[in-house]
């Protein structure tokens, strides 16, 4: 009789129990691991699977997380190069891809990452045909479109992390200037994640008080207080962090865990995330851009009809045209 048998009396033989709330993270670079630890700290999954092509790094990251099991509430952490390890995931988060270099525009990354997605997405679909896909790799709006096309999934199940982080950065920077916590600074950035994102100045408010009504020049070139600089800081922030530490990780990891929580707990919160916007705000092509979306366990169920000023809508359409110009040239 083994020590285990002496210690434990078995009363029911379990068949291999299937995870009910499994999350997979594809790519164990700085962003993937920041997503993983943020998800683990929020107790969102009963199983976390990690996938990557670099096997030593992958195993090392898995072991490092497993060694912290005592301090976590996720009973199973697994990893593998083979996508069989991802089977039956409810949510699959794609962070894999070529990393943005210092000074490199997100859109330059695109064809490099399309080729990587041609391998990843069919494997994810094979093992988790009913999952939600959350794309984080850049340029995120185009790669969300690519994931949608390759997966064959309905559009509500293919989500881009989009402007969830841009809006968080915006709220943080507004809060810094006002001396108020970002949770109480309500503001939205829509459109493309990154260089041509659109700040909705007309909707910025604190406790329902519209800042543009108090200060009509808000966000314009003629503003003596230069609030427009706040949006410029949002656009520049990733480039600044990359220049200083080589990559971004923590904020995007927290942002992704925020989205994962909304999905896994069916919270139906509204997030500025990338979805198919054809037919909205005058967009005519199959383009994914961030708009405020209701998110839950089945993915994106609804889109909030934002009231945008004509110049805000023009910027959104211009973003869509830029993205479509690149998308139509893609080889996949």
From Swiss-Prot:
The residues responsible for catalysis, as annotated, are 193
GO molecular function ontology, one term from the record: L-lactate dehydrogenase activity
Name where it mostly resides.
Answer: cytoplasm
Entry binding sites for NAD(+) = 29-57, 99, 138
Which residues are substrate-binding? 106, 138, 169, 248
Q: Which GO terms describe its cellular component?
A: cytoplasm
> Which Gene3D superfamilies does UniProt cross-reference here?
Lactate dehydrogenase/glycoside hydrolase, family 4, C-terminal (3.90.110.10), NAD(P)-binding Rossmann-like Domain (3.40.50.720)
Source taxon at top rank: Eukaryota
Q: Which UniProt keywords apply?
A: Cytoplasm, NAD, Oxidoreductase
Keyword presence, tRNA-binding? no
User: Which Pfam families does the record match to this protein?
Assistant: Ldh_1_C, Ldh_1_N
User: Which pathway does it serve?
Assistant: Fermentation; pyruvate fermentation to lactate; (S)-lactate from pyruvate: step 1/1
**Any idea where this protein resides?**
Cytoplasm
**HAMAP family in alphabetical order:** Lactate_dehydrog
State whether it acts alone or in a complex, and with which partners, per the record: Homotetramer.
Q: What does this protein do?
A: Interconverts simultaneously and stereospecifically pyruvate and lactate with concomitant interconversion of NADH and NAD(+).
Kindly provide the name given to this protein in its UniProt entry: L-lactate dehydrogenase A chain
The record's gene field reads LDHA
